[in-house]
Amino acid sequence: MRKNNMQTSKDSELKEQAKGKSSKLIHKLPKQRTRISQGQMHSTQDFVNNEDQDAYSVRENENELHINNSGMSELNKKLQLPNVELSTLSHTQEQEFNELNKLIRKINELQEFYLLEDLAKPVTNAGADADDTIVKDLKKELENEKKANHSLKNELLKTREQIKNYSKINILIKELFGLEVADCIEDEDGYRFNCKNTGRRGTLEYQLLLDDQNFTFTPRLNVQTDEELMKHLPDYLLEEIIFTKEQGKLFSARLMKALQD
């Protein structure tokens, strides 16, 4: 009997201990929930802060985009040569014109690089130190090109004046001698002038090839359209002939006489 009572007492103690542990566990649960809720509040606040930072970044990007767009219009401001008919230029003038054109293209390329380098600064400065020497060299070269720009403009003005003068000279030659030079082509044989002379009998089109010593005359006659003219021309003007530079004035006089008589 005593053993049974002792066993019952122990069972009661164990039950009381179990109840105490359960009560402690129940009291702990709300605190754990409270801590979870506070963690969620911290996460929510972090989310709001991140949203504000993202909005600020968007505003920064928009400002950078505005700066870049305003600068891009500068890329369209480039030096340009005046429109010139190359056929009106002599061989030397055409070479000078092409050299000026190359120089202007180089200036425009350097200016474009300079502008793009400036526009890239608001976007990122990564690697700027590594390229600093190259940029400085290019800026120095650009400054030198700008200094030469003034003399380049003067050369362009002179070229335009020369073109006007040559046009006036061609008008004078046409009025006095009836000679027009359409163009000049340089090849391995020399200079080929495409010409035409006009007189009372009509207009004769021909090509003159000038090499180091001689002229080569090649008429360009059409049997159908130039039939009447061919009747009045001497035979030597109906075929290819070669004569020296010294004989050039004599040939010109005979050609004009044949077209007038």
Swiss-Prot record:
Biased composition (Basic and acidic residues): 10-19
Keywords assigned: Cell cycle, Cell division, Centromere, Chromosome, Coiled coil, Meiosis, Mitosis, Nucleus
Record keyword Cell division present: yes
Domain of life: Eukaryota
Gene Ontology biological process: attachment of mitotic spindle microtubules to kinetochore; cell division; meiotic sister chromatid segregation; mitotic chromosome centromere condensation; mitotic sister chromatid segregation
Basic residues: compositionally biased ranges: 21-34
Coiled coil region boundaries: 91-170
Signal peptide extent: none
Disordered: annotated segments: 1-42
Compartment(s): Nucleus, Nucleolus; Chromosome, Centromere
Pfam families: Csm1
Subunit structure: Component of a monopolin-like complex composed of pcs1 and mde4. The complex associates with the kinetochore.
Name recorded for this polypeptide: Monopolin complex subunit pcs1
Gene that produces this protein: pcs1
